[in-house]
Amino acid sequence: MPSRRSILMLPLSLGLPLAAAAVPTTGTPVLAGMTSRGEAVSLDALRGSVVLVFVWSARCPVCLDKLPELRRNLEGWQGKPFVILALNQDRSADEMLNYERALERTGAARAQLKNLWRGAADHRDNFGDLPQNMPTALIFDKAGALSQAVRGRVPAELWDDIAELVLG
């Protein structure tokens, strides 16, 4: 007989969307700060583009597994109104910067993927507490409204939803 815990963990292990209780469902979502390259970025300034906020940690194997997929998918979206904000929530910005330097050495860096550290003094968001040990993907439409929130593994179908928002 399955335990209650195993039943509750099933959707998560399958990568099914969970309610994003920490993400504001009313009011205007806020995300603003500086990228690791010193570029000011905010959801407000990105209106007119579909934005995927990918919350990750260098200590999260699932997160690290998904980051190359995000970069590969960006190749098909060059010149389109689509941006990925990779929001790192490690204790230190050094972990994010080490990852970014490795990308630059391999030529895998992408202009449409902007890295931000959630712990920076100039960072602001109203997303509340987000899980440290699993990725969280937040999709904002061109008007800046939260369209979808997924915790855990990012399902392949999410890219179909993004395509509809970008091309629709």
Predicted segments with their positions:
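N-terminal secretory signal peptides and thylakoid transit peptides that target proteins
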Residues: M1-L14
